[in-house]
């Protein structure tokens, strides 16, 4: 099985059975002087710096490959929580670092989805939205007078 990669903390449709260790891969690259001069000219007129794009793509792949070798050595099925980091090492040289957690994982069993043909009981009272509901004994009437002798404030002046 090839090592699967996920930037999530889990692997979709898999159950993580064991966390093995943190694994990483890195590469340090420097710019090519000739490509750097061309990139400097391109920077003046604008546009994509394809030499740098290619350099970064190669660096990412090399760092990932090195991390996968370490994960395979641990017997991992996947690496989760995948992250990238970069740092400047020296003038014109940068490190690309990738890391994650090597795990053992097994596919989850797909549970069949059952749909019930029974509908939940309706709570419809039989009244339309325009009819005034009939108060029941369980519901106190809003028009009932208070039984105490305290004065009541009525904002409508009634």
Swiss-Prot record:
Protein name: UPF0145 protein Psyc_1853
InterPro entries found in the cross-reference section: UPF0145_dom_sf (IPR035439), UPF0145_YbjQ-like (IPR002765)
Biased composition annotated in UniProt, kind: Polar residues: 113-122
Stretch list, region Disordered: 113-158
Protein family according to the UniProt entry: Belongs to the UPF0145 family.
Top-rank lineage group of the source organism: Bacteria
PANTHER family hit by this protein: UPF0145 PROTEIN SCO3412, UPF0145 PROTEIN YBJQ
């Amino acid at each position: 099985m090839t090592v699967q990669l996920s930037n999530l903390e889990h692997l979709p449709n898999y159950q993580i059975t064991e966390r093995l260790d943190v694994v990483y891969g890195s590469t340090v690259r420097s710019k090519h002087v000739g490509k750097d001069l061309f990139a400097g000219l391109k920077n003046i007129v604008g546009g994509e710096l394809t030499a740098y794009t290619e350099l970064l793509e190669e660096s990412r792949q090399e760092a990932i490959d090195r991390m996968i070798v370490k994960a395979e050595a641990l017997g991992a099925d996947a690496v989760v929580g995948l992250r990238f980091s970069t740092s400047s090492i020296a003038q014109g040289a940068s490190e690309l670092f990738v890391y994650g957690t090597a795990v053992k994982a097994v596919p989850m069993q797909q549970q069949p989805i059952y749909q019930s043909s029974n509908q939940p009981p309706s709570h419809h009272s039989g009244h339309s939205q325009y009819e005034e509901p009939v108060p029941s004994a369980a519901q106190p009437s809003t028009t009932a007078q208070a039984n105490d002798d305290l004065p009541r404030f009525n904002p409508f002046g009634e």
